Amino acid sequence: MRILLFTGKGGVGKTTVAAATAVRSAAAGHRTLVMSTDPAHSLADSFDIPLTSRAQELAPSLWAEQIDAQERLESNWRDIQEFVVAFLNWAGVDAIEAEELSVIPGLDEIFSLTDVKHHVDSGRYDLLVVDCAPTAETLRLLSLPEAMNWYIERIFPVERRVVKTIRPLLTKLTSMPIADDRIFAAVERLHRNLDGVRQLLTNDRMSSVRLVVNPEKMVIAEAKRTYTYLSLFGYRVDAVVVNRIIPDEVEDPYFGKWKDIQAEHLETVKESFQPVPILTARLFDREMVGLDLLAEMGEEVYGERDATDILHRDEPLRVRKRGTSYMLSLRLPFTEKAEIEVFRKADELFVRVGSYKRNLVLPQTLQRLEVKEASFVEDRLEIRFAREAGTPARTGTT
């Protein structure tokens, strides 16, 4: 099975490109489901067909759904939310305010990703096309499972043991709500679901991200930052789609300057993202809405390509042995050395780029070694691990 995620700055046409990809895949005989995690819910507008939160067939081999984020929030967060509301009520917070405060902003969008795992597990489809929210929201979505994974593995077991130990005493001393096993089980269940999604989306044999851009300076700049942060968290970009290019046959002098500007920006995209394939779509003379026009756009974008293929293979993170040392290499395109912060604590390596931080749990082979040096060469952060001089080798599993 393949999973394709489409994202880009708001207004670039990512929903249209995602829908066109799904239509083209279905026409080739691949059982295709396209789903939207974007709160704007433009997918139904793109097909010009009303959609629900359940997959519905639009054409042979083509299904679509527009996720009800509130519904997913209630099914994933209900037990935890009830506890948080009870705690806030005990603390004197008004009931309505407690209800509002019990939901972390963005959780509804995050839970919509759990549908990805559900559809993969079902085995009903050959391709899952995900129309993601604009880039900032998508990055938050894709970075949360890893952050939660760190919390569950490092902090959660300690909290659970402490609460279990002191709960009998606290219930005698205070009326404050105390988390019970049901709440902890809900947190663990949520973690399993989100971590399962993370493993699927970082599987290089299954999942790819496709960035959609317009040939505009600010849009391209945001796409570069997005590519950097996706690489930081291990997500692979296999294509960039440049949408709404003014075609050569437009000869009106009003568009002459625009065509020159677009040509310059298109060259920038090709130079910046190489060797990632650059796909293009012209600015059509109408709205590309409905199955027939989306099929036309799919032909425009992919040409002779199979839309479901892995169009480019990248390796954001790799560990290789070099002599007696090991080199951990993390690809960080469009990054300056001064923007990167790296430090190690016990068996973890922390890498920060801009406002995003990733905690890498080192494999056991590297846990036994010391960091000797770090360098930034040709868009890769290279960190060399080796034993201290005179330190005997220790056995263990990788």
State each model region's role.
Residues 1-12, 16-195:
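Nucleotide-state-sensitive switch-loop elements of NTP-binding domains
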Residues 62, 326-328, 347-349, 381:
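Hydrophobic residues embedded in beta-strands of well-ordered beta-sheets
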Residues 109, 113-115, 330-334, 343-346, ...:
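Charge-patterned, long linear interaction tracts outside catalytic cores
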Residues 194-337, 350, 355-357, 361, ...:
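C-terminal lobe/tail of nucleotide-utilizing enzymes
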Residues 321, 344-345, 376:
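Generic beta-strand structural signal
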Residues 338, 367-390:
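Beta-rich strand-turn-strand
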